[in-house]
From Swiss-Prot:
GO BP: any one term: translation
The encoding gene: rpmB
Gene Ontology annotations for the cellular component aspect, listed alphabetically: ribonucleoprotein complex; ribosome
Pfam family, one: Ribosomal_L28
Source organism: Brevibacillus brevis (strain 47 / JCM 6285 / NBRC 100599)
InterPro entries: Bacterial_rp_bL28, Ribosomal_bL28, Ribosomal_bL28/bL31-like_sf, Ribosomal_bL28_bact-type, Ribosomal_bL28_sf
The protein, known as: Large ribosomal subunit protein bL28
SUPFAM superfamilies found in the cross-reference section: L28p-like (SSF143800)
Length: 62
């Protein structure tokens, strides 16, 4: 299962890590997702949800 937010669709982003000499190496920034039980179509389901969605009240835990 992809580490993607079920509600907002947030996923990992890629970019460059820059050293002191500005040499670039590829890296990824992960999204802070938690596996929680929420109501989906009236039934409880365990999905990955970003902490931003949890804090803002976009989902209600079961």
């Amino acid at each position: 299962m992809a580490r993607r937010c079920f509600v907002t669709g947030k996923s990992a982003k890629a970019g460059n890590a820059r050293s002191h000499s500005m040499r670039a190496t590829r890296r990824t920034w992960g999204v802070n997702v938690q596996k929680v039980r929420i109501l989906v179509n009236g039934k409880p389901k365990r999905v990955y949800v970003s902490t931003r969605a949890l804090k803002s009240g976009l989902v209600t835990r079961v």
